[in-house]
Structure formats: structure tokens, C-alpha cells
Amino acid sequence: MGTASADILLDGAGIHAAMDRLASEILASLPEGVPVGIIGIRRRGEVLAQRLVHELNRRGAEGLEVGSLDITLYRDDLAELGPQAILRKTEIDFDVNGRYIILVDDVLYTGRSVRAALDALVDLGRPKAIRLVILVDRPGRELPIQADFVGVRVERSDVAVTVLLTESDGAEEVRVG
């Protein structure tokens, strides 16, 4: 369905509230004495990762590293994308070895993007642990992947979910429909 018939699940204030709650949950779970890296899956995951780092720093977290991960070459549907595949740069300026990694994305649906991100991450090294943060979780897994931290859940698998963020889209809302 097009976005014209979509319902707004979260407006800007709802996204802010979900991110605020996620930051609180993540802060409470951070291990002591282990370096932490927060990595967003390009494109909207990187925006959400930046927001999380800002919120965590505001709450007193220290030493957080932030990066972004391009998963294009790790996707299992790359052949289907053909020449339309757009490669973006992975920007992780820290060693992932032995680090507690918080992987961030906007929507978790089939699990295939997260699988690609995990493959890309382990090609960079061996993190101590990887935790998954998702703004919107929806049913429809094709792989056994679950989020550790979820902003909001959509119960129906027959609806499309569109996340718009000011930094990348000029608008701030989550639409379903």
C-alpha cells in the first residue's frame, strides 16, 4: 500500500519517547569495564545510533564509540537488486574485537538485514557480545533473529512499515499500512 493510506503509528513525539525508553534500558544493561560501540545499519539505523549515543551521553554514559555499517554486499538478495544496488561506506573507526556492540536498525521484519549486518561485523573482528536495538519490530521472521531492545511492536505482518526520520527524510514518523 502507498503511504497515502498508511496510518501513523508514531509521530515525532512518539519516536522521541521510544528512543528515550530504549536509552534507559540500554544504559541499565551496559557492562562495566568493557568498551562499547554503537553501530547503526545504514541508512536509518545510523541516524538512530547517533540519537542513542546522544541520549546515553546525556545520561552519563562515557567512552561510547559510534559507527555505521553498510550491508549491501552481505545481502542475500544482492543479485535481485542488480545495478540499482548502492554501496555506501562502512564507517567504524574503532576495533570491534572484545567490544560490546550495540547494533541499531529501524525495522526488524524477516531478519535478513540483521543477518547481513552480523556477517559484516564478524568480518571486522570478534566482538565480546552483540545486542540488537530496533525501533519497530514486526512479525514475519525468516531467520531466528530477535531484538534485545524494541521501541514498539507491530502485531500484524500484513502491513508495510515505513520509518521517516528528519535527518534522512525531512519528516519524523512511523507509518503502517
Predicted regions: what they are:
Residues M1-G177:
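PRPP-associated nucleotide enzymes
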